[in-house]
UniProtKB/Swiss-Prot annotation:
Impact when changing residue 397 to K: In RAFQS; disrupts stable protein expression
Name the UniProt record assigns to this protein: Endoplasmic reticulum mannosyl-oligosaccharide 1,2-alpha-mannosidase
Gene encoding the protein: MAN1B1
Disulphide bonds in the chain: 527-556
GO cellular component, one term: extracellular vesicle
Organism from which the protein derives: Homo sapiens
Entry's family note: Belongs to the glycosyl hydrolase 47 family.
Residues at the active site: 330 (proton donor), 463, 570 (proton donor), 599
GO molecular function (one): mannosyl-oligosaccharide 1,2-alpha-mannosidase activity
Membrane topology, Cytoplasmic segments: 1-84
Length: 699
């Protein structure tokens, strides 16, 4: 034990060389008996500076983890999956940034363009100016003798009804006009008019894939636009009278209207739309949408008391100096169309003054690089813009405002309204991307080009484009051949690409086409087509159009009849292949709502006017009874419903759309009338919101 201790102490006390080097001769290690002591180390040299240690916090432990390391070393330490995820994220962010930059550049460009245009042209909204000579001819006054009406075409089908002037009794304009319109009208009526050349001018024949159309006698077709006489007269003043005898079905429509009006007047007066279940209202534009939409309906139904009350609200409460965005399309067809129609039926210049004021406030929407209007415009500030999520407008929106703007130009003498919308029509006419007359659903307001190419439908976002091709041609005295050609070509495109037959009943329907793939989906909105086809036949288009109209009318009726409530859903799908136990029409749960839409009864009206077949009246009566049974709210009003397949629980949606009064009930009233002179199709053309506007006399 002592030896061990001595060895340990010697090893510790000796120098390093003694400890490592064995004795000479290789003798074993010996126990050190002498301890060698080294002198202490010299003191550190004197320093003339002070060393300061900076603390990195209480937890600093002299670790080097805080020091900078090489980014590349750090990158290499990551796994391959981590590196790939980071690279993917960076690429995605770069792509999003690029898209954002492009979109931002477009918006800045459009903003700069709008600012420049606003400096050049500010909307004139100070009120109605004294009318200048109208740019377009006056409305057509149909011959009182049906035998004297000109023949349109040898192909025109025989109708079982009388033709003649409209039977609506229209009162003269007010004498206390503040804007001098009546005085100007007198001057224009006294002004000399150039006589027409003697002799019967040569009739020009338009032929398009089997449609042979002869213009009205005395017209020529040198250009797309209707020729303008120098100083045509204003619409003649007409006197007010009492409506013709009403049958029980028309009285039924009046009862429904009065119940709906009761709810609106009590719970939503002056607001946009009634919420009948909750006995309240909803706002869209804050402009009394339902009231304006229903003005001409009240006049046609003979409800003079209700009309005068609504007219008083328009006079006292309807002002457009509001900081509010309105949709160009919806506000044009409902508000502008409703005011123009009310003016034509009543002769009250109040409605024309309001219409011009509103039309001026919509004009900033057309200040785009492509002249394709933006979808929304602020009627107070004059700032227009596309939807928040895109720079596109829908084709239906930009091509279904022409009837109203053209008529506003004709009445006021201000060309800008007509010129703006006809630039759009002309632009669409020359665009590529169509398919045998069918157009895509979207168009870019900056580039002016179609987007979402290869998708074609006659449903939402495209429907009224086709309707307005025909109706503009009719409105302008059948002189604008380009419109007729585009319409007829589109109908042929429908036959070629969109028409199919269901199983097992072989119902004819119009589907959709997406990049060459057909879908057996049909919106209820497409039920405007039978009526439009029938209207074309009434004005001289081929009889084959009437055959298609009758087939599609049967389909639209079945879309109502095959539902348990007797009301059509918003969208249906047709079976293309025979399968046991399956019907022609099927409805998905998300599509089984009904919004009180007018398209089916609109087409029933046209089909009855053209054919005289009373089954169309019977079908309309069934639909009216279904509305009364499943949508009526006892306290007042009618509500759209969620489920047309459950008569026990149709589930009211608590909303009465303005078009229920403006369109649905108006078309039902006209359908049940046996008087073809009540808004004769020879004298009036209805806009897509059912507001009648006069047909212009050919120049």
């Amino acid at each position: 034990m002592a030896a061990c201790e001595g060895r340990r102490s010697g090893a510790l006390g000796s120098s390093q060389s003694d400890f490592l080097t064995p004795p000479v001769g290789g003798a074993p290690w010996a126990v050190a008996t002498t301890v060698v002591m080294y002198p202490p180390p010299p003191p550190p040299p004197h320093r003339d500076f002070i060393s300061v240690t900076l603390s990195f916090g209480e937890n600093y432990d002299n670790s080097k983890s805080w020091r900078r390391r090489s980014c590349w070393r750090k990158w290499k330490q990551l796994s391959r999956l981590q590196r790939n995820m980071i690279l993917f994220l960076l690429a995605f962010l770069l792509f999003c940034g690029l898209l954002f930059y492009i979109n931002l550049a477009d918006h800045w460009k459009a903003l700069a363009f709008r600012l420049e245009e606003e400096q050049k042209m500010r909307p004139e909204i100070a009120g109605l100016k004294p009318a200048n000579p109208p740019v377009l001819p006056a409305p057509q006054k149909a011959d009182t003798d049906p035998e004297n009406l000109p023949e349109i075409s040898s192909q025109k089908t025989q109708r079982h009804i009388q033709r003649g002037p409209p039977h609506l009794q229209i009162r003269p304009p007010s004498q206390d006009l503040k804007d001098g319109t009546q005085e100007e009208a007198t001057k224009r009526q006294e002004a000399p008019v150039d006589p027409r050349p003697e002799g019967d001018p040569q009739r020009t024949v338009i032929s398009w894939r089997g449609a042979v159309i002869e213009p009205e006698q005395g017209t020529e077709l040198p250009s797309r636009r209707a020729e303008v006489p120098t100083k045509p007269p204003l619409p003649p003043a007409r006197t007010q009278g009492t409506p013709v005898h009403l049958n029980y079905r028309q009285k039924g429509v009046i009862d429904v209207f009065l119940h709906a009006w009761k709810g609106y007047r009590k719970f939503a007066w002056g607001h946009d739309e009634l919420k009948p279940v909750s006995r309240s209202f909803s706002e869209w534009f804050g402009l009394g949408l339902t009231l304006i939409d229903a003005l001409d309906t009240m006049w046609i139904l003979g409800l003079r008391k209700e009309f005068e009350e609504a007219r008083k609200w328009v006079s006292k409460k309807l002002h457009f100096e509001k900081d509010v965005d309105v949709n160009l399309f919806e506000s044009t067809i409902r508000i502008l169309g409703g005011l123009l129609s009310a003016y034509h039926l009543s002769g009250d210049s109040l409605f024309l003054r309001k219409a011009e004021d509103f039309g001026n406030r919509l004009m900033p929407a057309f200040r785009t690089p492509s002249k394709i209007p933006y979808s929304d415009v602020n009627i107070g500030t004059g700032v227009a813009h596309p939807p928040r999520w895109t720079s596109d407008s829908t084709v239906a929106e930009v091509t279904s405002i022409q009837l109203e703007f053209r008529e506003l130009s004709r009445l006021t003498g201000d060309k800008k309204f007509q010129e703006a919308v006809e630039k759009v029509t002309q632009h669409i006419h020359g665009l590529s991307g169509k398919k045998d007359g069918l157009v895509p659903m979207f168009i870019n307001t900056h580039s002016g080009l179609f987007t979402h190419l290869g998708v074609f439908t006659l449903g939402a976002r495209a429907d009224s484009y086709y309707e307005y091709l025909l109706k503009q041609w009719i409105q302008g005295g059948k002189q604008e051949t380009q419109l007729l050609e585009d319409y007829v070509e589109a109908i042929e495109g429908v036959r070629t690409h969109l028409l199919r037959h269901s199983e097992p009943s072989k119902l004819t329907f119009v589907g959709e086409l997406a990049h060459g793939r057909f879908s057996a989906k049909m919106d209820h909105l497409v039920c405007f087509l039978p009526g439009t086809l029938a209207l074309g036949v009434y004005h001289g288009l081929p009889a084959s159009h009437m055959e298609l109209a009758q087939e599609l009318m049967e389909t639209c009726y079945q879309m109502n009849r095959q539902m348990e409530t007797g009301l059509s859903p918003e969208i249906v799908h047709f079976n293309l292949y025979p399968q046991p136990g399956r019907r022609d029409v099927e409805v998905k749960p998300a599509d089984r709502h009904n919004l009180l839409r007018p398209e089916t009864v609109e087409s029933l009206f046209y089909l009855y006017r053209v054919t005289g077949d009373r089954k169309y009246q019977d079908w309309g009566w069934e639909i009216l009874q279904s509305f009364s049974r499943f949508t009526r709210v006892p306290s007042g009003g009618y509500s759209s419903i969620n489920n047309v397949q459950d008569p026990q629980k149709p589930e009211p949606r608590d909303k009465m759309e303005s078009f229920f009064l403006g369109e649905t009930l108006k078309y039902l009233f006209l359908l049940f009338s046996d008087d073809p002179n009540l808004l004769s199709l020879d004298a009036y053309v209805f806009n897509t919101e059912a507001h009648p506007l006069p047909i212009w006399t050919p120049a």
